[in-house]
């Protein structure tokens, strides 16, 4: 499963291979979310911070442990309800699981978010910016002068994050300890009437990709659903805590007797579309996101799309890479200490910053490939269809292959986005506009080189495998 060199790669299942899968889940909530010290992630807020004022439903972590029976180890996928999680916290959780991983031959621990704009801030950018602006520079000077390690202020609540670490670790262990053999089935459910793209070139995946694991022992099934839809049903500026539409998909899947886990796809500017729901005018946002999630849940549960059995085969490899920070807003946030990402200076005067992050490649069975991406990917980078010089912001072409081109035509490409880091929007270089344009995607992107840098790193990774 974990490809350390070309000899580890399997093109067909090992002899006597069989799927094994386990599931774990827990609430991230502590009961203290309304104490005025828990901020809601989703948008920068200045000068007033976004302290949580109400709890509408739950904020959870969901985990699967999966093994292809080849003897090459077990993979973990943990998905957190939250706006983002940085590589710093991903590595922190991995560190707490190090002994358990070694004892159980876990070869990869992947942690992502569903990117709700309405959960307690797990990323750090949505705290009290006024306090950060005035306090963190002084703390930086003290740390640099005296060699101290005072923690800089950000939007994370320390107690909440400790609880998040604890229950995520426990849920990983629960998933591993509950692994059982079974069969895996895959189907594609058309959901285009519920999805819209807000940005040219209007390329997006309209499918819900469902993996249905059926245990041999007759216990509860586990359904993994991969789809690309922003979870921003309550807007980006609200102060109510909600798990948004994924929470209500889960309610329907649970009613059908199955466990549920969702992984976001390439959802850069992909959002929900409510036209076919026929909602009365003035329907409150919290009610509309509930109806939207329930509708998607019923669509998934009631689907009669043909399923194919997935051969028990996983090939998996990760690669670290560095993304230049050319966005002045994020550069300022990095120097301020508001970013929890691993940001490194690559010059002596600390003026050139890069985010150290990781991407990966996964094969599930013999016909499906997955790009594991550390941010919110423009779908055209995954599937092709870039804007040409006549239609792009810079007036130039973007002469790069898509990730599907790099993978080849013999496998369908899926995207597991926001995985192991949140580096923001990953756009084509030729369509990254000025942050003064007011385009939201540019404000929360590392800059104008994220697209080409990510494509190059993915291509290098694929060359190391094949």
Task: Please provide the spans of the model-predicted regions.
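Conserved beta-alpha junction segments in alpha/beta enzyme cores
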Residues: 4-291, 297, 304-466
């Amino acid at each position: 499963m974990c490809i350390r060199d070309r000899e580890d790669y399997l093109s067909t299942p090992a002899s006597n291979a069989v799927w094994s899968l386990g599931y774990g889940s827990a609430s991230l909530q502590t009961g203290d979310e309304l104490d005025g010290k828990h901020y809601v992630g989703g948008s920068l807020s200045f000068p007033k911070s976004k302290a949580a004022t109400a709890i509408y439903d739950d904020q959870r972590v969901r985990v699967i442990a999966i093994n292809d029976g080849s003897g090459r180890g077990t993979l973990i996928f943990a998905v957190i309800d939250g706006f983002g999680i940085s590589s710093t916290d991903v590595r922190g959780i991995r560190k707490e699981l190090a002994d358990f991983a070694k004892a159980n031959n876990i070869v990869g621990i992947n942690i992502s978010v569903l990117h709700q704009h309405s959960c307690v801030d797990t990323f750090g950018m949505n705290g009290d910016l006024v306090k950060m602006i005035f306090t963190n520079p002084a703390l930086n000077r003290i740390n640099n002068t005296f060699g101290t390690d005072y923690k800089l202020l950000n939007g994370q609540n320390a107690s909440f994050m400790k609880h998040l670490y604890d229950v995520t670790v426990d849920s990983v262990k629960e998933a591993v300890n509950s692994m059982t053999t079974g069969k895996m089935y895959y189907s594609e459910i058309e959901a285009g009437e519920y999805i819209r793209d807000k940005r040219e070139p209007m390329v997006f995946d309209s499918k819900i990709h469902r993996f249905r694991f059926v245990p041999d022992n007759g216990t509860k099934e586990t359904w993994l659903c991969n789809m690309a839809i922003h979870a921003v049903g309550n807007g980006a500026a609200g102060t109510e805590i909600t798990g948004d539409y994924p929470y209500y998909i889960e309610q329907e899947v649970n009613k059908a007797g199955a466990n549920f886990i969702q992984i976001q796809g390439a959802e850069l500017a992909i959002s929900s579309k409510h036209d076919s729901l026929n909602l009365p005018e003035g329907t409150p946002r919290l009610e509309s996101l509930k109806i939207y999630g329930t509708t998607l849940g019923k669509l998934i549960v009631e689907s009669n799309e043909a399923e194919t059995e997935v051969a028990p085969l996983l090939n998996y490899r990760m690669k670290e890479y560095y993304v230049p920070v050319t966005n002045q807003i994020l550069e300022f946030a990095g120097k301020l200490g508001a970013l929890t990402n691993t940001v490194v200076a690559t010059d002596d005067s600390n003026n050139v910053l890069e985010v150290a992050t990781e991407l990966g490649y996964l094969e599930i069975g013999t016909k499906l490939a997955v790009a594991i991406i550390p941010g919110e990917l423009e779908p055209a980078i995954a599937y092709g269809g870039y804007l040409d010089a006549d239609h792009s912001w810079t007036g130039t072409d973007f002469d790069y292959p898509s990730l599907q081109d790099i993978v080849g035509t013999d496998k369908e490409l899926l995207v597991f986005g926001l995985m192991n880091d949140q580096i923001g929007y990953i756009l084509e270089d030729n369509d990254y506009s000025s942050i003064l344009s007011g385009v939201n995607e540019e404000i929360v992107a590392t800059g104008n080189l994220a697209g080409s840098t990510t494509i190059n790193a993915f291509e290098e990774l694929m060359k190391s495998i094949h």
